[in-house]
Amino acid sequence: MNVTVMFLVLLLTMPLTDGFNIRAINGGELFGLVQRDAGNALDHGFYRRGDCPPWCVGARCRAGKC
């Protein structure tokens, strides 16, 4: 029972942790976008590297292009 509860808590908090890590890296400008796309590993990678132009929003950004 306790293991199951801990597993569920871990699953629920992982996207939040990832969002806060990215917020710390890029100064928080994309925090809202990252929270919305928390499950999209590709978007996270592009946000971390800073390849996206500022006018790209969310999932439209691929390899630095809209």
UniProtKB/Swiss-Prot annotation:
Post-translational modification (record): Contains 2 disulfide bonds.
Main location as per UniProt: secreted
UniProt signal peptide: 1-19
A GO MF term: toxin activity
Propiece span(s): 20-47
Domain of life of the native organism: Eukaryota
CC annotations in GO: extracellular region
Subcellular location: Secreted
The family this protein is said to belong to: Belongs to the conotoxin L superfamily.
Tissue distribution of the protein: Expressed by the venom duct.
Keywords attached to this entry: Cleavage on pair of basic residues, Disulfide bond, Neurotoxin, Secreted, Signal, Toxin
Domain notes: The cysteine framework is XIV (C-C-C-C).
Protein name per its UniProtKB record: Conotoxin Cl14.1b
